[in-house]
Amino acid sequence: MMAYIGFILSIMFVISFVGFSSKPSPIYGGLVLIMSGGFGCGIVMSFGGSFLGLMVFLIYLGGMLVVFGYTTAMATEQYPEVWVSSAAVLGAFVLGVLMEVVLVLYVYKNGEVEVVFNFSGVGDWAVSDNGGFGVFSEEIVGVSALYSYGVWIIIVTGWSLFVGVLVILEITRGA
């Protein structure tokens, strides 16, 4: 049952990003991004990462919802563009969904998809399971590895969020 829930959540996750990338009005784009954040956190929670899923959901909705609200207030339109308002937007959405269906059918037929990258030297990231109960939880080990080995990922993520806010403010300033 959990495999089906994870599969449905991952399909909804990708379809929501296809819906965002088909360039609807900013009001609907922000709504779809919030929904995709919820689906992504549901995927994390379905794999057993309740703490990490909750933290991502709170940070995502707490931080980025302010940006979505501000940009939609600055870029409101009298007649907002929805997915069915023009043939180009609807075609982009349908094409993205069809590409996702083709990928799912390909994976279903072949049983697996090869990984593009070779992951070597990940011994510090791997969590060994001895079959019993231990002192450390797997997600606590992952969070500590993120803050120790992945400090540059945190810095780049924070910087890119800051630059994203500045770009959004600059785009909506002239509107």
From Swiss-Prot:
Function: Core subunit of the mitochondrial membrane respiratory chain NADH dehydrogenase (Complex I) which catalyzes electron transfer from NADH through the respiratory chain, using ubiquinone as an electron acceptor. Essential for the catalytic activity and assembly of complex I.
One Gene Ontology MF term: NADH dehydrogenase (ubiquinone) activity
UniProt topology in membrane: Multi-pass membrane protein
Keyword Amino-acid biosynthesis: no
Family membership: Belongs to the complex I subunit 6 family.
Cellular compartments annotated: Mitochondrion inner membrane
SUBUNIT field: Core subunit of respiratory chain NADH dehydrogenase (Complex I) which is composed of 45 different subunits.
Any Pfam family matching the protein: Oxidored_q3
Record bears the keyword Membrane: yes
GO terms of biological process kind: mitochondrial electron transport, NADH to ubiquinone; mitochondrial respiratory chain complex I assembly
Gene name per UniProt: MT-ND6
PANTHER family reported for this sequence: NADH UBIQUINONE OXIDOREDUCTASE SUBUNIT ND6, NADH-UBIQUINONE OXIDOREDUCTASE CHAIN 6
Regions that span the bilayer: 1-21, 25-45, 47-67, 87-107, 116-136, 149-169
Protein name: NADH-ubiquinone oxidoreductase chain 6
Keywords: Electron transport, Membrane, Mitochondrion, Mitochondrion inner membrane, NAD, Respiratory chain, Translocase, Transmembrane, Transmembrane helix, Transport, Ubiquinone
EC number: 7.1.1.2
One CC-aspect GO term: mitochondrial inner membrane
Catalytic activity: a ubiquinone + NADH + 5 H(+)(in) = a ubiquinol + NAD(+) + 4 H(+)(out)
